[in-house]
């Protein structure tokens, strides 16, 4: 058997020199040579998981946490295909996720030989492939053309594994990846809009931000003093509460601003989608991803937020030209009243959960409903800067994996996901023993199925057979899942049950099942939907 010793060692050394600082490794036979070198490289940070799909989302979480490139390593066949959901998410987040997939020799392609699929260009536009059919095809610097702004796929054809091969000493260390410089887009157009066009009203919408983006975004919002809609994942939702509009989609539809300035990722608020039908509002985005987030014309400036704002120069105060914050006070008061009168609703449970989670150093929000509820109902008294989510392209896929990746080095971390989300990704909890010791709380809102689908227009009028297909109702408890993975289990049905969270043990892993009252949840939804703007 042929062991591709120098080839594999050289490939992994180049990846390390290109800045790959952590490795998420999945088991297999075809990738054994890669695993043997990684096992011998004692100075590299390595994680392992049997589920490639989950492993890729865990790697994405690690990238979110450390801001550096991470690789996921798989064997051949559908093991490589399992990476696709996380690859798509990483593409739209512009994260440096490296996919290193082992492949059978190129002669097997198109043959339907066991565990042989067409792996070159497997991920389409989402991750270009560098296809290494032979050792001679390895370039001198395999990552030299990678921009680190989206995933990259290295597909390496390997002979049959040799379990007896000893790679010897493997002194591999990660180097610093290159820094991104400059920005793209028209600053002059943005500057004119802020200075002149904003006299007709300006609203600042802040999507997800990386930690280095929070200070410049905070500074700009405080300078402009315009109404702000800040997602929890911006890390600024609480700090900018004095400027904020709360649950203001209807208000903004009735009183659209002349100019909307978006900072960071695409916002979650419904009004962002409504902008498709409001051409009179000029939209300007300042974002590291470069995506407009809209199907209509808008202006996008792409790059480092701090560098862009520095280039803009002095910023004039705009203020709340249209008096939106004053008009929003009535809705804020109604929301607070409803949380008191419906304490067992999903909305009130999210508020209570957020009060406890605020003492953590990491919060993770999974799937649509927890994200939207958190943005509207979570506490605003205590700043929570480190809030993460994979919200862009997937709903329930890989959310627990992402949480564990983000929180792997945290001392106190909290997550809130839906019930279908938790069931879909529960095997990610097999990663728990590898993580740093710390207090982790996984909150699961169990509303008996896909609760968000019950709120879709016309859902109430659907026949029961259709509702089953749409909502996926169930009567499962999460106690067995907690026990399977060695987690403490708590159930919360009432406001008083939250007192249990006062007695969490240090370095404990706890699954908290929140079981809300459906009638109270629906009461809040209908009151807010029918309330005057």
From Swiss-Prot:
The keyword Transferase applies. It comes from the Bacteria. Catalyzes the thiamine diphosphate-dependent decarboxylation of 2-oxoglutarate and the subsequent addition of the resulting succinic semialdehyde-thiamine pyrophosphate anion to isochorismate to yield 2-succinyl-5-enolpyruvyl-6-hydroxy-3-cyclohexene-1-carboxylate (SEPHCHC). Binds 1 thiamine pyrophosphate per subunit. Homodimer. Its cofactor is Mg(2+); Mn(2+); thiamine diphosphate. GO terms for molecular function: 2-succinyl-5-enolpyruvyl-6-hydroxy-3-cyclohexene-1-carboxylic-acid synthase activity; magnesium ion binding; manganese ion binding; thiamine pyrophosphate binding. It comes from Akkermansia muciniphila (strain ATCC BAA-835 / DSM 22959 / JCM 33894 / BCRC 81048 / CCUG 64013 / CIP 107961 / Muc). Belongs to the TPP enzyme family. MenD subfamily. Gene3D superfamilies: 3.40.50.970, TPP-binding domain. It catalyses: isochorismate + 2-oxoglutarate + H(+) = 5-enolpyruvoyl-6-hydroxy-2-succinyl-cyclohex-3-ene-1-carboxylate + CO2. Keywords: Magnesium, Manganese, Menaquinone biosynthesis, Metal-binding, Thiamine pyrophosphate, Transferase. The keyword Transferase applies. PANTHER family: 2-SUCCINYL-5-ENOLPYRUVYL-6-HYDROXY-3-CYCLOHEXENE-1-CARBOXYLATE SYNTHASE (PTHR42916), PROTEIN PHYLLO, CHLOROPLASTIC (PTHR42916:SF1). Pathway: Quinol/quinone metabolism; 1,4-dihydroxy-2-naphthoate biosynthesis; 1,4-dihydroxy-2-naphthoate from chorismate: step 2/7; Quinol/quinone metabolism; menaquinone biosynthesis. This is 2-succinyl-5-enolpyruvyl-6-hydroxy-3-cyclohexene-1-carboxylate synthase. One of its GO terms (biological process) is menaquinone biosynthetic process. HAMAP family: MenD. It holds the Pfam family TPP_enzyme_N. Its EC number is 2.2.1.9.
